[in-house]
């Protein structure tokens, strides 16, 4: 594992034109000062309108994984010599998945993740737009194990604990965390908790206000925020000390102390 990592965060809006959004990602990468190792975008980068996502737009903009949109994203990563974590509406047969795509710096796809927990809350029905994902993704990249999650997933610590058990060092969370009463504080609390309770870094990248909470965060396993943006559109480079992962695990060895046999006595849960 390297000593440190430079994470580029693009807290940006997205419009209905997926090609324009992709161009803006490229511009955002160019605007980052320094040398990012990986760049992370928000969720819904394949298209939003009026601060939200509609069934019609998802169907219009969705493409298969081997498509022009994903190919152009791969070209962006390779041209800039950076890894890129972005999102797409990926068609597969009769389904469309809200998919995070980890693209390595050579343009090859390192891994994909289909959003497991769809946002059917606060009056939204994301399951009307997408099919449910059913897998866990941890990518081996340059000596770092990178787990993938998406937005609403942060409310479900089980997914993050599974990635902990699979050895994840860093979780990337592209997000469209909607604004609302107390929502900004909820976002901060959830990202920070998922990092500290699992001995890994978590980088959550969101869309800006007013429709979303902004506040993109990188949280350390030691229990503090390395960086937190404000509410406006913002691009920034965040350096993390990867030695804090080992330090955290030595001080508080969560995976070692977890009582797996005890948990299995009460799982699976078949509640309503």
Each model region followed by its residue ranges:
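Extreme N-terminal starter segment of soluble prokaryotic enzymes
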Residues: 2-8
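Short polar catalytic/cofactor-binding loops
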Residues: 11-16
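Short, acidic/polar
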Residues: 20-29, 156-161
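Cys-nucleophile CN-hydrolase/nitrilase-fold catalytic domain and related Cys-dependent amidase chemistry
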Residues: 27-106, 178-196
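Structural motif
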Residues: 37-38, 146, 170
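CN hydrolase (nitrilase-like) catalytic-core segments centered on the catalytic cysteine
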Residues: 62-85, 154-236
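Active-site catalytic loop in hydrolytic enzyme cores
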Residues: 91-166, 179-189, 193, 250-258, ...
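C-terminal beta-strand edge segments of enzyme domains
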Residues: 112, 138, 207-272
